[in-house]
Amino acid sequence: MKKVQRYFLDYEFSKNNKSLEIKNENSFKIILNDKKNYEINKFFYKQIGKDHFWRDRLVWTDKQWLKYSSNPLLDTWILKDNNNDLIGYYEIEKHDNKEFELINMGILSDYRSKGFGSLLLDHVLKQSY
């Protein structure tokens, strides 16, 4: 069995934080999965997770996926290009004490190493304050 290591980021905002500058920012969009479509979460988890040993939710039924993605405290953001091709996503959960937890974030394999992960992380940080 391969050992998986988890990392945690505790980030405090200051006025000195700068946004990433992304070239051709009009060629993509980051949208909220406001319809709470569990199939989006399931698709990304399986596709991205197979390369990163995400296993916990592989046994979930559609009912479990629906319950998870319907959580009113959970937001799923989707990165798409202008052709509506999926690029990546992240799930963020709000907590009572004005904290946010980044549950999952990932980029589909065809789009990795092109700066999209940095773009999503920048979006995560902007959404959390």
Positions of PLM-derived features:
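Conserved acetyl-CoA-binding loop-helix of GNAT-fold acetyltransferases
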Residues: I107, S113-S128
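Acyl-donor-binding surface of acyltransferase catalytic domains
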Residues: M1-K29, D34
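A generic alpha-helix structural signal
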Residues: K42-Y45, S69, L125
